[in-house]
Swiss-Prot record:
The keyword Hydrolase does not apply. GO terms for biological process: nitrogen fixation. One of its GO terms (molecular function) is metal ion binding. Keywords: 4Fe-4S, Electron transport, Iron, Iron-sulfur, Metal-binding, Nitrogen fixation, Repeat, Transport. Homodimer. [4Fe-4S] cluster 1 binds at residues 27, 30, 33, 37. This is Ferredoxin-3. InterPro entries: 4Fe4S_Fe-S-bd, 4Fe4S_Fe_S_CS, FdIII_4_nif, Fe-S_Ferredoxin. Ferredoxins are iron-sulfur proteins that transfer electrons in a wide variety of metabolic reactions. Binds 2 [4Fe-4S] clusters.
Length: 96
């Protein structure tokens, strides 16, 4: 299988690393990664105290919010999300 390699503007070879998972136990829901990603890959979702997903409208049930991968196919492999994550929640992989 061929390696997907890109080149930066300066000519440096670069292998994209695509988002694979987010450690939701470590995630504090700060939203930094969401702001860094302009590709609509991520979504902030709410959890209740039992760890079940709840709709944002149910504010009284929300225990905390965590980031999720909403559109993995839109990831371009830039790793901007993980570079700004204060808790190192992201796992990335190349297409190899």
């Amino acid at each position: 299988m061929a390696t997907l390699t890109n080149v930066t503007f300066g000519g440096t070879a670069w292998i994209p690393q695509f988002v694979q998972s987010i450690n939701q136990t470590k995630c504090i829901g700060c939203g930094r990664c969401f702001k860094a990603c302009g590709r609509d890959v991520l979504a902030l979702k709410a959890l209740n105290d039992e760890g079940e997903w709840v709709e944002d409208e149910d504010d009284e049930e929300i225990e905390r919010k965590v980031m999720t991968i909403a559109n993995r196919d839109k990831c371009i492999g830039c790793e901007a999300c993980s570079r700004v994550c204060p808790k190192n929640c992201y796992t990335h992989e190349s297409l190899n």
